[in-house]
A protein has these predicted regions:
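Short intrinsically disordered, low-complexity coil segments enriched in acidic
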Residues: 2-3, 161
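Active-site-adjacent bridging/hinge elements
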Residues: 1-2, 139
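Active-site SXXK
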Residues: 14-31, 50
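Short active-site loop at a secondary-structure junction
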Residues: 3-21, 37-39
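Active-site-adjacent helix/loop patches that line small-molecule binding or acyl-intermediate pockets
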Residues: 36-160
């Protein structure tokens, strides 16, 4: 028996649930990530100092730093890290943004593949095309319109099921 409420084939924007596919595309295109760094690439984080250090380490391993990130700045959601930054007179930063792990992995793949790093969030960029290919491969779903997520990354419209 099949049952549903509403339209299970309605097109939605998957947003953060796409992070595993974005991480897969990054690794397939040369991002070398330890298990811990891969976990941060495939899921959001709270901006703890440990999380920021992991994203920074991915960037440093490719010769880049925080200035290469194209995600917004944010205050850490982790309270001890937030209050430490405030006490030190520091402002919000990109490494504290909850998608910085994913963005660091994106940049690692760009460096490994010889792709432009400035435009890594452009929907036509080879890395973003690889992300869309991974989404289609693993979901078996068609992709509709492309929107831009809050972190600046392209996000496809796709059916819920």
């Amino acid at each position: 028996m099949n049952a549903s409420l509403g339209n299970p084939e309605a097109m939605i924007y998957a947003r953060s649930s796409l992070k595993p596919f974005q991480a897969i595309a990054s690794v397939r295109n040369g991002a070398e990530l330890s298990d811990e760094r891969l976990a941060r690439a495939g899921a959001p984080h709270v901006g703890s100092q440990r999380h920021q250090d992991l994203a920074a380490a991915v960037l440093e391993s490719t010769g880049l730093d925080e200035s290469a990130l194209r995600c917004p700045t944010a205050w850490p959601q982790d309270e001890p890290t937030f209050f430490a930054r405030v006490r030190e007179g520091l402002d919000k930063n990109q490494l504290a943004f909850n998608c910085s792990g994913k963005h660091s992995a994106f940049l690692s793949a760009c460096v490994a593949s010889g792709w432009d790093q400035e435009s890594y969030l452009d929907p036509s960029h080879p890395l973003q095309q690889a992300v869309m290919d991974a989404v289609v491969e693993f979901s078996g779903s068609p992709i509709g319109n492309i929107a831009i997520d809050g972190c600046g990354a392209p996000v496809p419209q796709m059916p819920l099921v």
